[in-house]
Amino acid sequence: MIQAQTILQVADNTGAKEIMCIRVLRGSSKKGARVGDIIVAVVKKTKKQTSVKKSEIVRAVIVRTRTTIHRANGMHLKFNENAAVLVTKELHPKGTRLFGPIPYECSEAGLNSIISLAPYII
């Protein structure tokens, strides 16, 4: 579950390494955000010479959480890190490549543009 002040890894090639959640925009509950939810975040760490600058305010979609994901078929899924993908206001990814697995809960949330870039879907 992602809430304000949570540090997330960035799972795309925009140049940002870490972001910190400021606000949950479209969440599944009042408490926090889960996989497929949209957040507003600030960039904390970047790579050198990137399009995204440090302390820039961005929107992101959560793609991996350390909190367990419970599926209807009885399967439980848990990742080692909290990760997000930077998106535009129209929910299109800013990067051209994604890293790591993407759960299919993102496609259920209507984020097909992110699913199309995913290397593999769990």
Swiss-Prot record:
Disulfide bonds: none annotated. It comes from Helicosporidium sp. subsp. Simulium jonesii (Green alga). One of its GO terms (molecular function) is large ribosomal subunit rRNA binding. Pfam families: Ribosomal_L14. The keyword Cell membrane does not apply. Belongs to the universal ribosomal protein uL14 family. Keywords: Plastid, Ribonucleoprotein, Ribosomal protein, RNA-binding, rRNA-binding. The keyword Nuclease does not apply. This is Large ribosomal subunit protein uL14c. One of its GO terms (cellular component) is cytosolic large ribosomal subunit. InterPro entries: Ribosomal_uL14 (IPR000218), Ribosomal_uL14_bac-type (IPR005745), Ribosomal_uL14_CS (IPR019972), Ribosomal_uL14_sf (IPR036853). Its main location: plastid. Part of the 50S ribosomal subunit. Binds to 23S rRNA. It is found in: Plastid. SMART domains: Ribosomal_L14. One of its GO terms (biological process) is translation.
